[in-house]
Swiss-Prot record:
Name used for this protein in its record: Endonuclease V
Keyword terms of this UniProt record: Cytoplasm, DNA damage, DNA repair, Endonuclease, Hydrolase, Magnesium, Metal-binding, Nuclease
GO molecular function: deoxyribonuclease V activity; magnesium ion binding; RNA endonuclease activity, producing 5'-phosphomonoesters; single-stranded RNA binding
One Pfam family linked to the record: Endonuclease_5
Enzyme Commission (EC) number: 3.1.21.7
GO terms of biological process kind: DNA repair
Major site of localization recorded for this protein: cytoplasm
Gene (UniProt): nfi
GO cellular component, as recorded: cytoplasm
PANTHER family to which the protein is assigned, alphabetical: ENDONUCLEASE V (PTHR28511:SF1)
Amino acid sequence: MINTQQLRQEQTEKAQQIILTDQFMAPTYIAGADVGFENSGAVTRAAIVVMHYPSFEIVEYQIARIATLLPYIPGLLSFRECPALLKAWQGIKQKPQLVFVDGQGIAHPRRLGVASHFGLLADIPTIGVAKSRLCGDDKKLDDDVGSTEKLMDKDEQLGWIYRSKKRCKPLYISPGYKVSMESALAWVKRCINGYRLPEPTRWADGIASNRRLFEQLNKNKL
């Protein structure tokens, strides 16, 4: 039986170890990380894509598949996803200086989303780039590209709400680990290239979702 109370306590304790200052050099390699599922959720599939910055040329990628260890439990997603992410990370030869993770950083009820959890375990600077809001007050943005609001939980800033593309839902950006609030937004902006998602997580999302087009395009780019 899964002890959810113990897992939540572990999140609270690990959140105290999260560093929210910039501890990385100007990156020449940036990675995107995302997780998908196969066999009706029985298999967890993680993809990590390393890209040269600023060309966004793909350097390498790793896909890891493991038996799913936990069912979906709101707020405990990182315990479900991190084991597969760590397995994929172990196979990466060209380690990046910065990783964009599809999911939350500190914008989490206990301030430990998958980007923060993975960054702490792998000891790598991370940014959470989420497609939906998990916590904090939602705010309506103008439809203009670049419209930005702070993602707040009472008096605490958790991240940013950012319009990356017209007529698309905004992104919810938050620092994960060893990245400041300001840098989290700035680096996502630098990696937007005409799509809703920044290039690193756009590619990781496509590969982790098992889309054949992304697999083929990726082979062509290598």
